[in-house]
Regions:
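Short helix-capping/linker turns of helical repeat alpha-solenoids
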Residues: 47, 60, 77-80, 93-95, ...
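Alpha-helical segment of the N-proximal tetratricopeptide repeat
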Residues: 48-74, 78
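N-terminal secretory signal peptides that target proteins for export/translocation
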Residues: 1-12
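Structural signature of tandem alpha-helical TPR/SEL1-like repeats
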Residues: 63-70, 98-107, 134-143, 170-179, ...
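Hydrophobic face of amphipathic alpha-helices that form TPR/SEL1-like repeat modules
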Residues: 52-59, 71, 84-93, 122-129, ...
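Bacterial N-terminal signal peptides
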Residues: 16-27
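Terminal, low-structured helical/coil segments at or just beyond the last alpha-helical repeat
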Residues: 39-43, 253-274
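Canonical positions in the second alpha-helix
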Residues: 74-75, 110-111, 146-147, 182-183, ...
Length: 274
């Protein structure tokens, strides 16, 4: 999703809309297990479930989806939240089963009820995309807020996107910036890139190419190839810095090597073939 470039130059990219993949994201983190005060029976049950999930994860990573599904169902039946998350992702992406977003929602809700913030974020994505239920940006925002309040940085970024693009709420760049900064403060490099775009575009703030470069560099240092491309755009266009074609090529090459198609096209337009 790109923005029109200044001075008729090359466009730059705001990056993907979501921090998680369209496939609902991967299992992030692990929910709390049995508390220390749990009874011996409860502790043994939790340990058994964890062992099952570990075996299921091995099967999942090896591509043995049918075996993983059986194991995760057993672990979820005795209350393991990680297993519920895996099941939600499997139903949402069609691994080992036909795609069933309603079933994915059921499992994510169970995990969310147990306090799993990634499940809350994934429920928000289902509402945002209208998968298994009518599309609702408002419901998506509600779930992203729940996840963000539990510390989920992907949800923080998603809230920022909704305010930036006016999805279910009026456009509010200041609020978008606030949420992007929260996510970036927790190490989210996609949010750092998004902040750079706001400064480069002058959305809710004065145009500040130096600040834009600072945020792009933060994101690029974390491996964000969209930010690498955006740095190349600044160098090529001489935006806030002395125009330097060689530096632009350096950054386009870094981004292209990481798979950025915009950077690959930029190199071609500059006559660079390697």
């Amino acid at each position: 999703m790109g923005f029109a470039a200044h001075r008729g130059r090359r466009s730059w990219s705001a990056g993907p809309l979501w921090a998680t993949t369209v496939a609902l994201g991967l299992l992030c983190g692990s929910p709390a297990r049995a508390q220390s005060g749990a009874s011996t029976v409860q502790s043994e049950t939790a340990a058994s479930a964890k062992a099952m999930v570990d075996r299921g994860a091995e099967q999942y990573d090896a591509g043995n989806d049918s075996a993983a599904l059986v194991i995760f169902r057993r672990a979820a039946a005795i209350g393991d939240v990680d297993a519920m998350m895996y099941l939600g992702v499997m139903y949402g992406t069609g691994r080992g089963v036909d795609v069933d977003h309603a079933a994915a929602m059921t499992w994510f809700r169970q995990a969310a009820d147990a306090g799993n913030s990634q499940a809350m974020c994934n429920i928000g994505l289902l509402y945002f995309q209208g998968l298994g239920q009518p599309k609702s940006y408002r419901d998506a925002l509600g779930w992203f807020r729940k996840a963000a309040n539990s510390g989920n940085t992907e949800a923080m970024f998603n809230i920022g996107v909704q305010y930036r693009d006016g999805l279910g709420v009026p456009v509010n760049y200041a609020e978008a910036m606030r949420w992007f900064r929260r996510a970036a403060g927790e190490g989210d490099n996609i949010a750092a890139n998004a902040i750079g775009v706001l400064y480069q575009q002058g959305l809710g703030v004065s145009v500040d190419y130096a600040e834009s470069m600072r945020w792009y560099l933060k994101a690029a240092d974390a491996g964000n190839h969209t930010a690498m491309y955006n740095i190349g755009v600044l160098w090529e266009g001489g935006l806030g810095i002395t125009q330097n074609r060689d530096q632009a090529i350096v950054w386009y090459r870094k981004a292209a090597a990481a798979g950025n198609e915009h950077a690959q096209a930029a190199l071609q337009s500059l006559g660079i073939k390697d």
